[in-house]
Amino acid sequence: MIIPWQDLDPETLDNLIESFVLREGTDYGEYERSLADKVADVKQQLKRGEAVLVWSELHETVNIMPRALFNG
C-alpha cells in the first residue's frame, strides 16, 4: 500500500528517508555525498512522483521504492 508522503509529519518523513539511505548504502560514484544530500535527493524523487513510500502488511515495515517497480 502506498503511503502519501505529504501526510507524514516532516520530521517523520526525514527519519524514514534517512533510515532508507543508511540501509541502502548506494554507491554514488567517484565522490562520496553527504547524508543530507542523499536525503534531499530521495525527498525530491518523492515530490516528483518517481519514488513512493510503501507499507508492507506482511513485514509491517515502510520502504521507499521506484514507482515503476511498485505493483501493489
Curated annotation (Swiss-Prot):
Disulphide connectivity of cysteines: none
Taxonomy, superkingdom: Bacteria
InterPro entries linked to this entry: UPF0270, YehU-like_sf
A Pfam family reported for this protein in Swiss-Prot or TrEMBL: UPF0270
Entry similarity comment: Belongs to the UPF0270 family.
Name of the protein in its database record: UPF0270 protein KPN78578_37030
Organism field: Klebsiella pneumoniae subsp. pneumoniae (strain ATCC 700721 / MGH 78578)
